[in-house]
Amino acid sequence: IGDIMKEKVLLLLKEGEYISGEKLSEILGVSRTAIWKAINSLRDDGYEIDSVTNKGYKLVKKPNVLNASTISEGLNVKVVGTEIITLKTVDSTNEEIKRKAHENARSGLVVISCEQTAGKGRLGRKWASNEGGVYFSFLLRPELPPSDVSGITLAAGLGVCLAIRKFTGLDAKIKWPNDVIVGNKKICGILTEMTAQTDMVDFVVIGIGINVLQESFPEEIAYKATSLKIETKSEPDLSELMHEIIATLDKTILSYLFGISQDDLKLYKSMCATIGREVSLVRNGEKLTGKAIDITADGELVVCLENGKKIAVNSGEVTVQGIY
C-alpha cells in the first residue's frame, strides 16, 4: 500500500467520528480491500484505529511521529520548507540534502528524520543522534559570494530559538555561534556546510539537531544536555513542533537573504547567552581570555581582551564560562 493512499485515508479519518469502509472506498475510488490494507498499514505505523461493524473506522490516537502532511498543513513559506521529506532513518540529513542537491533539488527542500546513523557535528566530529531527537536539514541556493554565508547560522539559531520559545514557553537562549540552550544546557546544535565556486555559492546545507523526547542522557553528557520533554515535563508533538520551527526559520532566513536587519540583530543579541560572559579562545596558537561584548552584522563575536583590545572572532573554539 502506497504512502499516498495511507495519507489520504488518514486525512479522512481525522474527524474523530466513524466513517464506513464503503464511503472511504467511494471517496478515494479504490476497493474496500485497499482501504482495509491501508488501515492495517496505519495500525502498523502506530495509529490506534477503532473499527465497528456497520459503523466503520474511527481514529482514536495518533502516534507521535513525523508526518509530512501534518507539518506542511497551513504552512505559507517562501524559502524554507517549500518541499518536506520525512524519513524513518538516514545516515545524516546533511548528507541526504547534499545528494539531493547534486540531483538538482530545488532550494527550500527540508529533510527530517528521528534517527541518524552517521550524524556529524562541527569540525567533523561525530554527532550523537540520541533516540528522542529530531534531526533535519534544509537546502538553500542563495546568489551570494561565499564570504556572505557566515551569518546564515545566526539566522538559523534565531529561528529555532524563537520557535522553541513560542512552542514551549521555555526561556531558550543562543550560545554563539551554533547552539540553542535552556538553563545553560544544550538543546539544539546547528551545522552549516557550503559548496561553492571561487566567487559564488553553489548551495548551502543547514543541519539542525534538537533534543525533543529524551528523558535522560548518557552520564558523560548529562551535565550539558537537556531536552524539551525534560524541561517542559510534557511530550511535544513532533509534527506540530516542526511546523512551528519551519515557519519561523522561513522568516529569519528570508530576512537574512535580504541582509540581516538591525531589528533581527538586536533580537539575536537579546537572546544570546554568550554576550556579557567571560570567554577564552585560541588564536594563532595563543590562548586569549576576555569578555564577549557584541555580535556584528556578519555574525562575528566581538571580544574585549584583558588588555582592553577588541577582536572579532568569526568561528572556531570559544569556551564560555558558566556554559558547558
Regions found by a protein language model. Give the residues of each.
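N-terminal lobe of the biotin/lipoate ligase/transferase fold
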Residues: 6-165, 188
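Short loop/edge segments at beta-strand edges and connector loops
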Residues: 88, 174-176
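Long, positively charged amphipathic alpha-helical accessory segments at protein N-termini or as interdomain linkers
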Residues: 2-23, 27-30, 40, 44-45, ...
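A local structural micro-motif
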Residues: 50, 172-173
